């Protein structure tokens, strides 16, 4: 077996309009496919950012994920950016709440990378 890379990550959301606005208008993803699946009464939106794909299922009445990091399931998505301070500023200007920038000493081999949660 020789896995080359992760093709996509699939996540669930509950609000079609807010989800699409967040990923497309605020984060800059491109919609590559979008379907309403009548038999399941949900939307499937395939998004692309560079070489990465995100598959979003917008499902009515999906159970909420517990709001603490140790809950099972997807914990976070991480993005590579050129200037983290500028990126955080622009996210905040778009109404996206961010946490303080911090050094991540566990996953980074040098102090050249910062993480904003």
Residue ranges and their predicted role:
Residues 1-17, 74-79:
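N-terminal beta-strand motif that seeds the catalytic metal site of vicinal oxygen chelate
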Residues 7, 43, 75, 114-116:
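Residue-level marker for the onset of beta-strands and adjacent loop->beta junctions
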Residues 1-2, 88-117:
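Vicinal oxygen chelate
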Residues 50-54, 61-62, 84:
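Short, charged/polar surface micro-motifs in flexible loops or helix N-caps
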């Amino acid at each position: 077996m020789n896995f080359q890379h992760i093709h996509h990550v699939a996540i669930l959301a509950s609000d079609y309009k807010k989800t699409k606005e967040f990923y497309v208008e605020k984060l800059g993803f491109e919609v590559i496919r979008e379907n309403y699946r009548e038999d399941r009464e949900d939307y499937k939106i395939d998004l692309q950012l560079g070489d990465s794909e995100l598959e979003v299922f917008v499902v009515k009445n999906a159970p909420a994920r517990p709001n603490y990091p140790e809950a099972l399931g997807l914990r976070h998505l991480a993005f590579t950016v050129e200037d983290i301070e500028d990126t955080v500023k622009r996210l905040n200007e778009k109404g996206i709440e961010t946490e303080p920038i911090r050094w991540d000493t566990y996953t980074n081999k040098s102090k050249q990378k910062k993480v904003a949660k």
